[in-house]
Regions:
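Short aromatic-glycine-enriched beta-strand elements
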Residues: 1-3
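Non-catalytic alpha-helical scaffolds and adjoining flexible linkers that form interface surfaces
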Residues: 5-196
Length: 196
């Protein structure tokens, strides 16, 4: 079973039978795929056929740091979005975010934080500094910069790995508050290791 996000179906699980040629490489975190949906009238679990990678994402796949980020970001999407949830514009926002990360050649260490803040906006509750400040603990100035700077400027906000990790956790708590659910992201520990 592969979990997907699409314009038509929102978040949904599908049965897949990967061929010998491409195999599981098709299903790396945040891959952008094209496929034919095969509905099953006897089951709510449909299948995918003719699966192809729409974009090779070589800028992500060639970087251990970006691959680690995609593991974290895909888990955030999985834990936050419910099966069948269709949010207007969310699919296009995700595609744009993935392609942006793929295109970045340097200065992407703050990307996870910016992704989480923009994800909240895509879900309909874009954070203002006043809204997110109670979640930020000791790093309010850095969070303010992440919110108020342009995208390119926010990638250059200086911060240590500890600050980066804390801001990711703050953004996750903000998402939990607004989605009224606990978001347990196991890959957060991997991200912590990546940024020390």
């Amino acid at each position: 079973v592969v979990h997907t996000l699409s314009r038509e179906y929102g978040r949904r699980g599908f049965i897949v039978r990967p061929g010998k040629k491409a195999g599981m490489a098709l299903f790396l975190p945040l891959n952008i795929l094209e496929a034919d949906v095969v509905e099953n009238p006897k089951s709510e679990l449909w299948s995918l056929r003719g699966i192809q990678v729409r974009d090779s994402l070589s800028g992500i796949r060639g970087s251990i740091r970006k691959n680690t980020m995609t593991l974290f970001l895909s888990e955030v999407l999985f834990r936050t979005l419910h099966d069948g949830a269709v949010e207007d514009g969310l699919y296009q926002w995700c595609i744009g975010s993935i392609l942006t990360l793929n295109a970045m050649e340097s200065d992407f260490a703050n990307y996870s934080i910016r992704f989480l803040l923009e994800f909240a906006g895509a879900l309909g509750f874009r954070p203002s500094f006043a809204d997110i400040a109670p979640f930020t603990q000791d790093y309010a100035p850095q969070m303010r910069s992440m919110l108020e700077c342009s995208f390119s400027e926010s990638m250059l906000v200086p911060m240590s790995g500890q600050v980066r990790n804390s801001l990711c956790e703050s953004a996750l708590r903000y998402l939990e508050y607004h989605t009224d659910q606990t978001i347990r992201v196991k890959s957060l520990s991997v991200l912590r290791e990546l940024y020390g």
